[in-house]
Amino acid sequence: MDKNTVIGLVLIGLVIFGFSWLNRPDPQEIEAQRKAAIEAARQDSIAKAEAELLAARTQEATPDSIKQAAGYNQYGLLAAATAGAEEQVELANGKIALKLSTKGGAIREVLLRDYKTYDGKPLYLFREGESDFNLPLRTLDNRLVDTRDLYFSPISRTDSSVVMRLAVDSASYLDLAYVLLPDDYRLRMTVSGQNLQSLFPANMTMQDLEWSQRIRRQEKSWKFENQYTSIYYKYSGDEVDRLSDSKQEDKKTLEEPLHWVSFKDKYFASVLVCDSYFENNKLAQKTAAAGSDYLKNCTMSATFPLDVRPGTKAGFTFFFGPLKYNMLRAYDKGMKAEDNLDLDHLVYLGASIFRWINRYMIIPASTFLQQYFSNWGLIILLLTLGIKLLISPLAYKGYLSSAKMRLLRPQVQEINAKYPGKDQESMMKRQSATMNLYRAAGAGPMSGCLPMLLQFPFLIAMYMYFPTTIDIRQQSFLWAEDLSSYDAVFSWTADIPLLSQFYGNHVSLFCLLMSISNILYIRYTMNQSDTGQEGMAMLKWMPYITTVMFLFFFNQNASGLCYYYFLSSIITVIQYMSSRFIINEEKLMAKLEANKTKPRKKSKWMARLEEAQRQQEAMRRQQQKRK
C-alpha cells in the first residue's frame, strides 16, 4: 500500500468520526427516547390484552353463530335442522304402542300390548338404541346428510298419526307421515315434501334408506329361538327367501328388486313393505353372544324411487306384530296374485308336502278346534286322533301285512334251517326261497312298514308346525307351563361337558315320556313282526339308537311337539294291539295256504327283486370260474 492510499483512509476515518460526534444526541434526548420506548411497549401490551379479552367475550357471546358456520360447512342447506330439542311422540291403538323421536323422525320403541316375554315382562320388539332408521339425503349442494342427525317438527298430531316435518326453508320441507291403522299391527309411512327441487338435484330418481334392529330375546330357550331368527325378504312379484338362520354371520347383496324385508324371531317380526320396490339391497345379520338378551343384529340398506316432481311421494307399511298365520294370510285378501305380500311365509311350515299338510290340514283343523276348546293339551290330543283316523284304512293294510308275516314265520324258519350257512350261495338260496314263499302266499315283506311310512309326512309336518305356531305360546297343560318351550321338571346349573351342550341342563318330562313310549312301540312291533332273518337281527338296534338320539335332540324343543309324539306312539301301539283282535288269524292262515295253490302274477317289485337275485347269482358263478 503506497503513502497516498494510507493518507486517504486516515482522512475518511476522521471525517466519519467527526460527523458522528457532531450529530450525537444530548442526554435529554436519550432519556426522552427511552421513556417513549417504554410507553410504546406498555401500550402494545394493553392492546394485545384488550384484543384477547374482546375475542374471549365474542366467543362467549356468539357460540351459536360459530356453530352455525361450522354446521353449514357440514350440513349445507340443512344446517339449521341440526339444532333442536329431542321430543318423544307416542302413537297407540289396542294392539301396539309406538314411540317416535323428533330427532331423525323415526320409530324408537314398539310395545306389543297383548303379549309378554317368557318371564312375564312387557314385550318390546325394540327400545331406545336398539333400532335405527335413516334416510341419507344427497342434497343439491353436494352433501350427504343423515336424517338421524336432524330434528323434525311434529305437526298434525293425533293419538294414531303424526307428520314429522324437516324444514329446509320457509317454502321447502320433507315430510314423514305416520298413520297407525286402527286395531292393527300395521303402520303406514309416507315420504313426501314441498319444493324438493330446492333440496335435491333435479336428476334425482332414487333415495337411499338404511334400517337396522337388534333382535331381542323373548323366549326361554335362547338356542331354539335363535334357530328361527333371521332376515326374510320377498322378491317383487316372486318368492320369499331368507338369510341363513344357522350361520354365525351372513350377508347378501341383491340386485333384484325386493317388495319387503323383515327382521323376525321365532314368533314376532318387524317388516318394512315398500309400495313400489327396493333396489341395490344389502342385507346382513350377525348372531349375538349365546344366552344374552339379544339374538341377532340385523341391517339393511337399499334405495327406493323418489324424485323432485311436485306431488311426488313414496309409500311404505311397517308391520310390528305376532306371526299369526291366519292373520298374515288375511292381508292378501282382495289382492292380485302378483301383488300378494305372502307374509304368511314368515311362519316356517316346512317345504313341499310338509307345508301343504300344515297349510291345508293341520292349521284349518286346529283353527276349527280352537272355536270349541281353549285347552291346547286337548286340542293336540284331538289332532292326533284325527290324523290317526285319517290314515287308519291304509294303516289297517299294514297291520294285515304284518299279521301275514307273523303267520309265515314258522315256514321262514324252516327255510333258514334248510339252507344253513353264511356263505353267499346259501344266503342267495335262502333269500330266493323266502321271496317265493311270500309271493305264493300273497304277503309283502315291506308292507309291515307302511303304518310308520304313512306317519312320516305328518310327524315331520308337526315337527315344523309346533315350534313355530304362536297359538301354543305360553299355553299350559298339566305340568308344562308353556307348550312352545321345554317342560323342565328337573334342572341344574353346573356345566357338564358334552351333556350340557347336547342335552341341556334340565330334564323335559314330555320328551322323556316320548322316548319311553317310542321304545315300547319299537319293542312290541319288532317282536311281533320279527321273521328270524339275519337282516332283522342286524337292524333291530337301529330304532333304539335313533330314539336315544331323539331324546337328546328334543329335550330343548317344544314340549307340545314331544307331547304329540308321545300320544302318536301310544295310539299306534293301541292300534297295533287292537289289530290282533280284529284280524282273525285262523281265517287269514287258511287264506294264505289257499293262495299257494293259485297262480299269481308277479308284481313289478317282486320281478325286479328276482331279476336282481339272478344277476347276483350269475356274477357269483363267473367269479368262481375265474378262480
Swiss-Prot record:
The cross-references to InterPro entries, in alphabetical order and at most eight, read:
Membr_insert_YidC, Membr_insert_YidC_N, YidC/ALB3/OXA1/COX18, YidC/Oxa/ALB_C, YidC_ALB_C, YidC_periplasmic_sf
Query: Which keywords does this Swiss-Prot/TrEMBL entry list?
Result: Cell inner membrane, Cell membrane, Chaperone, Membrane, Protein transport, Transmembrane, Transmembrane helix, Transport
Q: Name one GO molecular function term.
A: membrane insertase activity
Transmembrane annotation, as ranges: 3-23, 376-396, 450-470, 502-522, 534-554, 558-578
Record's Gene Ontology CC terms?
A: plasma membrane
Q: Where in the cell is it found?
A: Cell inner membrane
Q: How does it sit in the bilayer?
A: Multi-pass membrane protein
Any keyword Membrane?
yes
- Taxonomy, superkingdom: Bacteria
UniProt GO BP: protein insertion into membrane; protein transport
Keyword NAD attached: no
How does the record describe its quaternary structure? Interacts with the Sec translocase complex via SecD. Specifically interacts with transmembrane segments of nascent integral membrane proteins during membrane integration.
Q: Give the record's family classification.
A: Belongs to the OXA1/ALB3/YidC family. Type 1 subfamily.
Functionally, this protein is described as follows: Required for the insertion and/or proper folding and/or complex formation of integral membrane proteins into the membrane. Involved in integration of membrane proteins that insert both dependently and independently of the Sec translocase complex, as well as at least some lipoproteins. Aids folding of multispanning membrane proteins.
NCBIfam families for the chain: PRK01318.2-3, yidC_nterm, yidC_oxa1_cterm
Protein name per Swiss-Prot or TrEMBL: Membrane protein insertase YidC
Q: Which gene encodes it?
A: yidC
